[in-house]
Amino acid sequence: MKKAYVFLADGFEEIEGLTVVDVLRRAGVDVKTVSVMGRKQIQGAHNIPVDADILFDDINGEDADMLVLPGGMPGTLNLKAHEGLCDLLKAYD
């Protein structure tokens, strides 16, 4: 089974993050939402709280077939500020 991580940070665009999760899960992909905020509850760009499946520190980024970074402000800035995520993206092949 294919595996995907959708990385969430405070201020992410809810439609961009959650639609991807919905469509991929319907297609049979093992999708995990990953918080880069150090806590599972993330606040979307439109103040919608979302509980991530897992924290960034608890994933093995090498086992994913797909990495998804939703847009939104300030979500993209919060993703960019996460050193571990930046390192993972640079190493991802």
What are these regions (language model features)?
Residues 1-92:
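Extended, subdomain-level signal for the structured scaffold at the beginning of enzyme domains
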